[in-house]
Amino acid sequence: MSHACGANQALRLHHGTLNAVLLPTVLDFNRDYIGEKYRRLNAAMGQETDADPAEFFRDLNLKIGMPQNLGEMGITRGMISSLATHAAKDSCTSTNPRHCSTEEFKELFETAIGV
């Protein structure tokens, strides 16, 4: 998803910032597919093992002044279809623990854009 957003050269978006902003949305999407890894992640971060890692990263992003959603970075709803198509074709998508269809990418981008 970060690659899809970063491909828009006019916006000049930083890849690491995109990763940070998208991380909570992707963690929510994958939650039911990698529960044990989430418990290990929480333990490594000093959190309760049943804590919500997506919420942890939302809070962290807020504390360090990161954008809270893609909308704050200039991504609009009108871009969703092309972003989803790009993300679905990205070879990095194959490493995600949960398969994501183009339609699911559209939903994820909708969520990540925010209000």
Task: Please provide the spans of the model-predicted regions.
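Short, amphipathic C-terminal "tail helix"
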Residues: R77-V115
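Gly/Pro-rich interdomain helix-loop hinge
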Residues: G6-M79, V115
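Oxyanion-binding "anion nests"
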Residues: M1
